[in-house]
Amino acid sequence: MSDFENLSGNDKELQEFLLIEKQKAQVNAQIHEFNEICWEKCIGKPSTKLDHATETCLSNCVDRFIDTSLLITQRFAQMLQKRGGGDL
């Protein structure tokens, strides 16, 4: 019976590891999405150097997406907490 309990503990560790790896993959995918969207929005034609306006556009673009993503994540967490508490 102790082998079964250890297996269950190992399964939990594996699940946590997989969850962390999935979150890392999601962050990487989001970064690539930001890059693509902001590149299309801010870069008219590639050159050897970014001008100030382009740098500002890229920075603002990424900041907007990060702020929006954080807001959505926070709201989703709040909804889950309410649901867990039986309020939803």
Curated annotation (Swiss-Prot):
Subcellular location: Mitochondrion inner membrane
Any Pfam family matching the protein: zf-Tim10_DDP
Coiled-coil ranges from the UniProt annotation: none
Gene3D superfamilies with a match to the protein in the record: Mitochondrial import inner membrane translocase subunit tim13 like domains (1.10.287.810)
Motif (Twin CX3C motif): 38-61
GO biological process: protein insertion into mitochondrial inner membrane
UniProt membrane topology term: Peripheral membrane protein
InterPro entries to which the protein is assigned, alphabetical: Tim10-like, Tim10-like_dom_sf
Main location: mitochondrion
An example Gene Ontology CC term for this record: mitochondrial intermembrane space protein transporter complex
Disulphide linkage map: C38-C61, C42-C57
Sequence similarity: Belongs to the small Tim family.
Domain notes: The twin CX3C motif contains 4 conserved Cys residues that form 2 disulfide bonds in the mitochondrial intermembrane space. However, during the transit of Tim8 from cytoplasm into mitochondrion, the Cys residues probably coordinate zinc, thereby preventing folding and allowing its transfer across mitochondrial outer membrane.
Function (record text): Mitochondrial intermembrane chaperone that participates in the import and insertion of some multi-pass transmembrane proteins into the mitochondrial inner membrane. Also required for the transfer of beta-barrel precursors from the TOM complex to the sorting and assembly machinery (SAM complex) of the outer membrane. Acts as a chaperone-like protein that protects the hydrophobic precursors from aggregation and guide them through the mitochondrial intermembrane space.
UniProt-recorded name of the protein: Mitochondrial import inner membrane translocase subunit Tim8
Taxonomic source organism: Drosophila melanogaster
Gene label: Tim8
